[in-house]
């Protein structure tokens, strides 16, 4: 129904619906960012034997992130004298905008989606790569050696892990016969691809953590090595753009893993009475929890280990997975 309205003859009602749905998605994502950060701090606190935020907004610290955001907005916005001012100002926007653009092709249920394009997976991968341009630009424009090194690390990491990420997703595309995300979910009606493609799921999840610059692959902003990495010279709301982009991508990547490998909104066979939106939310939250669990568990790897793992381990395994998938599909389907 919603898709028919969006694709019908342009009019004021379509425009109002378009902006209304966009505002709704923005509100949902911002709510996730707000309480996703809180959940991450609480979960990590529990795993480390701490309480976590418990002062602002009651005993559970429900308003702690809101207070942190207000603090960021009230901080002074400084620009280094030696910085390339236009590029320094533009870089956070370049990093932030693609994070929202990728949400347009993510189907959250069989009825709630914004753009049902035939190459939704390709669109996601292509647009998400643009954020690295903003990261590198911010590191270079800051005229700071730590920021520049962080930006270069981000570029090298993205190039290295984008390849196994894409190649692991090719196994899913081979089984589904489409790069349309809705079709990929439909192909998992009987068997989720996490069972048909366990190796691809493992490769994709590891590469996704690297793409998100999260522990143990957070080398572009390694505090113990680079102070704060590519955004070391940023403060206030400009720094908030980089942080917001990181957590919006966490939202998007968790949703993409749910779509590609966990059956999207399809339920477990004997629990079909539960709505698809609830199933999607449960799977999505499980993926987010695993990503938080990684951060609280693994130590940061060295730069040489990061590169070797991508090129010597993940890339060969992704090639093996493609060959096995092609053979199985040719012989049994």
From Swiss-Prot:
Major enzyme class: translocase
Superkingdom, taxonomy of origin: Bacteria
Species assigned in the record: Geobacillus kaustophilus (strain HTA426)
Gene Ontology process terms (BP): aerobic respiration
Record bears the keyword Transmembrane helix: yes
GO CC annotation terms, alphabetical: plasma membrane
Regions annotated as coiled coil: none
Membrane topology: Multi-pass membrane protein
One Pfam family, short name: NADHdh
Similarity remark: Belongs to the complex I subunit 1 family.
Family matches, as PANTHER family: NADH DEHYDROGENASE SUBUNIT 1 (PTHR11432), NADH-UBIQUINONE OXIDOREDUCTASE CHAIN 1 (PTHR11432:SF3)
Protein known as: NADH-quinone oxidoreductase subunit H
NCBIfam families with a match to the protein in the record: PRK06076.1-2
Keyword Kinase belongs to the record: no
Reaction catalysis annotation: a quinone + NADH + 5 H(+)(in) = a quinol + NAD(+) + 4 H(+)(out)
């Amino acid at each position: 129904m919603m898709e028919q309205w969006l694709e019908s003859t342009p009019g004021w009602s379509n425009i109002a619906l378009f902006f209304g749905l966009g505002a709704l998605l923005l509100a949902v994502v911002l709510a996730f960012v707000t309480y996703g950060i809180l959940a991450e701090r609480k979960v990590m606190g529990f795993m480390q034997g701490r309480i976590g935020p418990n002062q602002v907004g009651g005993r559970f610290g429900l308003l702690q992130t809101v207070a942190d955001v207000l603090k960021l907005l009230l901080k002074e916005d400084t620009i280094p004298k030696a910085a390339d001012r236009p590029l320094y100002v533009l870089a956070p926007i370049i990093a932030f905008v693609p994070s929202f653009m990728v949400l347009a092709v993510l189907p959250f249920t069989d009825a709630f989606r914004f753009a049902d394009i035939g190459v939704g997976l390709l669109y996601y991968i292509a647009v998400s790569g643009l954020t690295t341009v903003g990261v590198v630009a911010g590191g270079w424009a800051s005229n700071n050696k730590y920021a520049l090194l962080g930006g270069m690390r981000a570029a090298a990491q993205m190039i290295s892990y984008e390849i196994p990420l894409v190649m692991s997703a090719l196994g899913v595309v081979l089984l589904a016969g489409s790069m349309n995300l809705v079709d990929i979910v439909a192909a998992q009606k009987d068997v989720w691809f996490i069972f048909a493609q366990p190796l691809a799921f493992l490769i994709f999840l590891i590469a996704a953590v690297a793409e998100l610059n999260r522990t143990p692959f957070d080398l572009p902003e390694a505090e113990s090595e680079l102070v704060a990495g590519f955004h070391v010279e940023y403060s206030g709301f400009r720094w908030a753009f980089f942080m917001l982009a990181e957590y919006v991508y966490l939202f998007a990547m968790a949703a993409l893993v749910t779509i590609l490998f966990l059956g999207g909104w399809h339920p477990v066979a004997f629990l079909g009475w539960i709505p698809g939106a609830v199933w999607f939310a449960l799977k999505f939250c499980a993926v987010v929890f695993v990503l938080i669990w990684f951060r609280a568990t693994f130590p940061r790897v060295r730069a040489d280990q990061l590169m070797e793992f991508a090129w010597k381990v993940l890339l060969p395994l992704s090639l093996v997975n493609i060959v096995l998938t092609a053979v199985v599909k040719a012989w049994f389907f």
